[in-house]
């Protein structure tokens, strides 16, 4: 698809996917890595463990987020958003984690 997505198409793309890529920059290096996420209508919420991504985002919280859907080589859509990384604590973190579990839980492999 060539052109710009409408606001509704952007919202649909963000809410109908669970894997995107976060891009960040520190020490003259770009870092782009896939993450699982939930879009709550306003924010992109993700969860990760301590590592290079968190280290970089703490040093420079300005980041971008990208999600795409590719149906074939001539039919694909993508959204790129720019924003600021924020670590959630306490009740905010618990609410975000609940949203992640509600959305991602059914996608987890079963042991049965």
Q: What role is predicted for each listed range?
A:
Residues 1-21:
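Short, basic/aromatic recognition patches
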Residues 7, 50-51:
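Structural motif corresponding to alpha-helix initiation and N-cap regions
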Residues 73-112:
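Charged, gly/pro-rich active-site loop segments
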Residues 49, 59-68, 75-86:
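Active-site-adjacent structural patch at catalytic or cofactor/ligand-binding sites
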Residues 17-49, 65:
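Short beta-strand segments
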Residues 52-54, 72:
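Short, surface-exposed beta-strand-loop junctions and turns on beta-sheet-rich folds
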């Amino acid at each position: 698809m060539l052109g710009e997505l409408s606001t509704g198409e952007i919202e649909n793309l963000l809410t109908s996917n669970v894997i995107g890529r976060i891009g960040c920059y520190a020490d003259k290096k770009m870092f782009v890595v896939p993450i699982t996420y939930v879009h709550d209508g306003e924010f992109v919420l993700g969860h990760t463990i301590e590592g290079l991504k968190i280290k970089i985002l703490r040093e420079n919280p300005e980041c971008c987020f990208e999600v795409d859907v590719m149906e074939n080589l001539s039919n694909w859509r993508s959204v790129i958003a720019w924003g600021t990384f924020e670590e959630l604590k306490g009740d905010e973190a618990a609410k975000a984690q609940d949203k992640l579990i509600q959305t991602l839980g059914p996608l987890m492999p079963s042991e049965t």
